[in-house]
Design a protein with these regions (language model features):
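Active-site acidic/histidine proton-transfer and metal-coordination neighborhood
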Residues: 4-73, 83
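Histidine-acidic metal/acid-base catalytic patches
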Residues: 5, 36, 56-76, 82-173
């Protein structure tokens, strides 16, 4: 949750027995209700771009669902896009104005396969370009470090978080 804002972050399951059109239509109806309720409570609604139990997580879905719902935001994590083979810089360029919260988690792929999510700044993500695009779009929301590595545990994980803090401090303007 952002310090300045109350945000409810959610996804939307895909129903295999329905068409993509039907899934999008039901998702829009669902999010419309959440947005209306959120406005009553001063809470902004955001989708997350993780693919687990959620189909509203890529440029195609954003174009339809977020394109229609102007008050639906995005909690963004570059690693989810990278690990799914997407273009996180393109998604940021096209949808970054709707990003309300950002996770900082590294992503490393080897031979086209997900290897690990090491500390942000020790990975393959072009963080300077990502942050440059975000700042250029006026982003001033939260940045949350999300340690989620198969290899970085305990004290090593703590040192990785410290590294990420130092790494991103140099990009804060």
């Amino acid at each position: 949750m952002c310090i300045r804002d109350s945000i409810y972050i959610t996804g939307c399951n895909y129903v295999d027995s329905l068409s993509y059109y039907e899934n999008c239509s039901f998702a829009i109806a669902y999010f419309e209700k959440l947005i209306a309720y959120g406005k009553e409570k001063n809470i902004k609604i955001a989708t997350y771009n993780c693919r687990w139990n959620n189909f509203v997580c890529n440029a195609e879905a954003y174009k339809i669902i977020h394109g229609y719902l102007k008050d639906l935001y995005i909690k963004y994590d570059t690693s989810h896009c990278i690990n799914a083979g997407g273009d996180y810089l393109q998604e940021t360029r096209d949808w970054g104005k709707r990003f309300i919260h950002v996770h900082l988690k590294g992503a490393v792929k080897i031979e086209g396969k997900v290897y690990d999510n090491p500390p942000a700044g020790m990975d393959q993500t072009d963080w300077t370009s990502f942050m440059g695009i975000l700042y250029g779009l006026g982003y001033d929301g939260g940045l949350s470090i999300e340690p989620e590595s198969a290899y970085w545990h305990g004290e090593l994980s703590d040192r990785g978080v410290d590294y990420t803090i130092r790494y991103f401090r140099n990009m804060m303007i």
